[in-house]
Amino acid sequence: MSVDERITALTQKMLRRKLYAVISAASPTPEKLKAFLPAHLEYMTALEKRGVLFASGPLADGGGPPDGAGLTILRTASAAEARELAEADPFVKNGLRKYELKEWTVMEGSLGLRVNLSDQSIEVA
């Protein structure tokens, strides 16, 4: 079997789901982010409730404190829609963050959910 055939065989059942990564650079003035953090969190929660936010959160170097950098993964139909959502983030709208948008093709990985029937709660494992 050739290398190309092996690659095809290995990837034929993979997910191939297109998502968009919003990679936000560290803020030159992270202390200014605090004033806009409630609005940012409300915005992210609203995106989550709409079903377009896959995951989001701060980035830090080697366990150090967050410096204003962040990563947000969006489920949108296009890069243009993802860019529109990124531009509407209060941190970006107020000039506190710059970002880079990348298309991300999810091929492999896993997500675990645990449903507790006794209290009808769900946990992400």
Q: Which residues does each PLM region occupy?
A:
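Conserved, structured core segments of small domains
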Residues: M1-A125
